[in-house]
Amino acid sequence: MKILEVIYGLSTGGAERLVVDLCNEMSKTEDVTLLILKEVNHFYLPQVSPNVKVIQAHWKIGFSIMQQYKAYKLIKEINPDIVHFHNSERYSMILSNILLKKKYSFFMTIHSDVEKNYKKGLSGLQVKLCGLLGGCKFITISETNYLQFQKLYPKFQQILIENGRALPQFTQQIDSVKKEIESYKKDHNTIVFIHVARYHPCKNQEMLIEFFNELISENINCILLVIGSGFETDKGSKIVEKANKGIYFLGSKNNIYDYLKNSDVFCLSSIYEGMPMSIIEAILSGIPIISTPVCGAIDAVKNGYNGFISSSFEKESYKKSILEFIKHKDSISDYSEKNKNNSKYAITNCAQKYISFFKSTIHKKK
């Protein structure tokens, strides 16, 4: 089976992380081509398997009818059985999806909150056009994500495939990472919180930093590690400036599992998500999770077992969950460690579900 994966770019992000892992895993048994459309930062590109054919289109950022036509021509040249695109590529694939629907099977993975991002506007229009006129099949990535889509678009074919991630592989840097984190700690009892996400308003990082400023000023023995890009931008740097001592911005890292392994708890403060890849990485690393009640997190985190979900997006609610974790830290950490080998979120399981779904549509078309 010849599969074409289409992505905007390979900068740091959950969709980008999934695409690389998915391509690598599927290429073990299938013919996989990865089409990268835009000229943006390709952080994950070195991690793409040699088994995957990579095509870089070098399009300029923005939307144009010419890009729609170029996508149409590229797909015909590649001639795949499957065209699988992701939410960042939605506008570039509309024309191809409609005109080539009888020749190829088109799929779109929804990586974000459906209610907030696909109910109306251009994104909602795109889903309707591809679903109604292009016969596109949709993949949702968490139970809540699935139910939201089913409610809004009951006539469109969709399937739930939870996001997957390659199992933890530690690098030669793990010992130096351990020493680095130890140097940040006040003493051996310091609780290490870690937040992995690029800077973006939807991540609600301003609230997160305000909260940890308060926590540290109240002499709670903890530190916060922030890993991700974008904090060097004008808006991101303002958050950095507000952070007190005990909050460390470490930039992007390609050895994220080394940092998770040496942290005590993962924290997410987002306003909306689809199924955060960072939560899956935390689960597979065996560390507890504290999160706001976003799509995906509410499906993966069981209150009082592998972490806590705050009752709302407000700072006081989030604080209550953090303090509850500190109170029950040992039992929560033990449960998370014992249940880290969760095949539900392993990329092997995820990729096999994609392959099975793809093959079922090829059979129907024939």
Where are these regions (language model features)?
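Conserved acidic donor-binding segment of nucleotide-sugar-dependent glycosyltransferases
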Residues: 303-304, 308-315, 324-329
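Aromatic "clamp/platform" in nucleotide-sugar-dependent glycosyltransferases that forms part
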Residues: 252, 271
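Short His-centered aromatic/hydrophobic patch
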Residues: 85-92, 110
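Conserved donor-binding/catalytic core segment of Leloir-type glycosyltransferases
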Residues: 4-6, 185-203, 209-212
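N-terminal strand-loop element at the rim of the active site
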Residues: 5-65, 145, 160, 230-232
